[in-house]
Design a protein with these regions (language model features):
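Nucleic-acid processing machinery
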Residues: 1-169
Length: 169
């Protein structure tokens, strides 16, 4: 089953490649104009197990599983402050990025999910929302800071590293 899903995901990547590249290029251009060059955008593809679970839950085939990928927007508040000379909190930057997206693209009604102020159990923090791209496809966007990603991935190791580094300075 998972080998078939891997092959289907690869085919889907090829099929959506041009539209996604155009969307990412446009988003990069918009965010660089509004915030600066330190914001990174990439595409994250869901794992076969995650897609299989959706297929089972929704009783559908691969073609009918929505959002096989999402657009990840990562930012570093310190780099943004150095670039712009203006301090903004992580929440302020995430909300500013959200505002930029929904002012340029039509937001899917009811798609906004705030994990930034109410993190998941694993301390995952981000803003999730969906917009209609200019190529006619709804794209799911996840906005988070580099620190939020590290905390969700490495947990207490990040916090203890920061405490250790603060003792050294």
């Amino acid at each position: 089953v998972f080998d078939n899903l891997d092959a289907a995901l690869e085919a889907d990547k090829i099929r959506t490649q041009l539209g996604l590249k155009a969307f990412i290029d446009e988003c990069n251009h918009i965010l660089q104009d509004e915030i600066g060059k330190s914001v990174r955008i990439d595409i994250r593809y869901r794992r076969p197990y995650s897609i299989w679970r959706d297929m089972e839950d929704k009783q559908c085939d691969f073609r009918n599983v929505p959002f096989k990928h999402y657009v990840r927007v990562l930012f570093d508040p310190l780099a943004i402050e150095q670039e712009t000379g203006q301090y903004l909190s992580e929440i302020d930057i995430a909300l500013k990025i959200y505002a930029i997206f929904v002012s340029r693209f039509k937001e899917q009604c009811g798609s906004f999910v705030n994990y930034a102020t109410v993190p998941k159990e694993n301390n995952y923090r981000a803003l999730h929302f969906r917009v209609l791209g200019n190529h006619g496809i709804i794209e799911e966007i996840h906005v988070s800071s580099v620190k939020w990603r590290e905390q969700a991935t490495y947990g207490c190791l990040v916090e203890s590293r920061e405490a250790w580094m603060s003792r050294l300075t």
